[in-house]
Amino acid sequence: MSVRELKNFVNGQYVSAQSGETSDVINPANGEVYAKAPVSGDADIDAAYKAADKAFETWSQATPSERQLALFRIADALEARAEEMADVESENTGKPRSTLVEYEVLVSVDQIRFFAGAARNLEGRATAEYAKDHTSSIRREPIGVIGQVTPWNYP
């Protein structure tokens, strides 16, 4: 079995960690090294943040319809590659492949489609009148790039 070299995906391109370091990725079911993953550091995080922040300029101006369509395209692409995603997840976690398509990959597809639908369900509420002859309202706007580290390979 050949050992794959994994890379970070930043600004639409696959790139190695700036340090050049990698770490073995081991299949827990058989103990074999099947990939090398980049050991990313502060410089890699900064590069990813800057790329995401630049993309945010366009994304934040997208209409609800455009955002919805983008999420639907992501869901469709994931669904089209469900078998491949299940193979990758099984190899990475040791989970039985037989359950991964239905209970993880397709559940993820469903969640993305749910939020795609929510993208067009805009909610605005009028608030109390704080000044005579003025109407106040609540407006939700994108705030920018965030980071998240999740445990146990979820969600």
Feature locations, PLM:
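Glycine-rich loop-to-alpha-helix module at the N-terminal edge of alpha/beta enzyme cores
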Residues: 32-122
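Basic, gly/Ser/Thr/Pro-rich low-complexity segments located predominantly at protein N termini
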Residues: 17, 25, 99, 122, ...
